[in-house]
């Protein structure tokens, strides 16, 4: 089918392209949207739930996995996470001892098939809001900043989480799952869907906040500002009680190592948790007003 445009339509389209291009290149307005991760960022201090599920799923096949083998890939789409774990030399070696061969793609599918129902059972046990979430939401609403989210959870998983979070006062404007786009993190597609759904443009008017390197890479690939959370999430990997019981010097050293990791990944800013991000949003707005882009 061929579409014909008259001269007026062509001129209007060209004007629109120029307007959009100018807005993108010269944007100096306020932050218009914040895109938040879920586990380790807004709920489940320490990102404990997913770690427990991966451990139980592999145990069902007679293979033990440790926290580091799980957490290094946190933030990816869950099936991609499983696949990446099976490619680890030490883990594949333990699999070989049990099964007499290296893990293959069918094994990845079989492990993931166990993860889905396990996650459905566990996710609501780890749905408590992280301190600062409600205050952040209130402040963002007051500034007319829209709230989106991206997650490695599937839609059935996150719907249970959303219900628990809503009961505690957190309800983002939109939720995009990695299973709803062609590729999850570090690809930017979930952020782009958020932008379209929220009707926010340009991407430099948006901030991605998360607790994994994959979150940072996702935001950077989408052309957004990024804030990495060092204490509340996957990288430290401790519950709130465990984290707060650490000796101050030990905690400070651990958080600095995590912050360096995020900065190496390209994060514009780091914070211990969402309770510290409001001043950073104000600083980003100041930089935007001066013509700085992410």
Where are these regions (language model features)?
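Asp-based, Mg2+/Mn2+-dependent phosphohydrolase catalytic module
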Residues: 1-32, 134, 138-139, 154-294
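A structural signal for short, well-ordered beta-strand elements
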Residues: 74-75, 151, 270
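N-terminal helical cap/lid subdomain that shapes the substrate entry/recognition surface
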Residues: 2-20, 24-134, 138-143, 159
């Amino acid at each position: 089918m061929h579409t014909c445009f008259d001269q007026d339509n062509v001129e209007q389209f060209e004007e629109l392209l120029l307007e959009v291009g100018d807005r993108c290149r010269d944007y100096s307005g306020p932050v218009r949207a914040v895109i938040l991760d879920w586990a380790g960022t807004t709920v489940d201090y320490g990102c404990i739930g997913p770690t427990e599920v991966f451990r139980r799923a592999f145990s069902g096949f007679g293979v033990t996995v440790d926290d580091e083998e799980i957490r290094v890939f946190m933030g990816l789409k869950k099936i991609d996470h499983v696949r990446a774990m099976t490619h680890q030399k030490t883990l594949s070696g333990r699999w070989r001892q049990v099964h007499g061969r290296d893990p293959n793609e069918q094994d990845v599918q079989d492990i993931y098939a166990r993860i889905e129902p396990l996650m459905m059972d566990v996710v609501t046990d780890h749905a408590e809001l992280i301190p600062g979430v409600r205050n952040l939401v209130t402040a963002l609403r007051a500034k007319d900043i829209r709230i989106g989210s991206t997650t490695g959870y599937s839609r059935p998983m996150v719907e249970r989480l959303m219900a628990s979070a809503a009961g505690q006062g957190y309800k983002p404007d939109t939720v995009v799952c990695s299973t709803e786009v062609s590729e999850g993190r570090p690809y930017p597609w979930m952020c782009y869907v958020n932008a379209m759904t929220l009707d926010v443009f340009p991407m430099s008017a948006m901030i991605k906040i998360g607790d994994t390197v994959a979150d940072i890479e996702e935001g950077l690939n989408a052309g957004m500002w990024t804030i990495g959370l060092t204490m509340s999430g996957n990288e430290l990997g401790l519950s709130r009680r465990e984290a707060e019981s650490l000796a101050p010097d030990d905690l400070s050293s651990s958080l600095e190592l995590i912050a360096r990791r995020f900065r190496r990944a390209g994060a514009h800013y780091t914070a211990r948790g969402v309770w510290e991000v409001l001043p950073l949003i104000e600083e980003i707005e100041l930089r935007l007003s001066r013509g700085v882009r992410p």
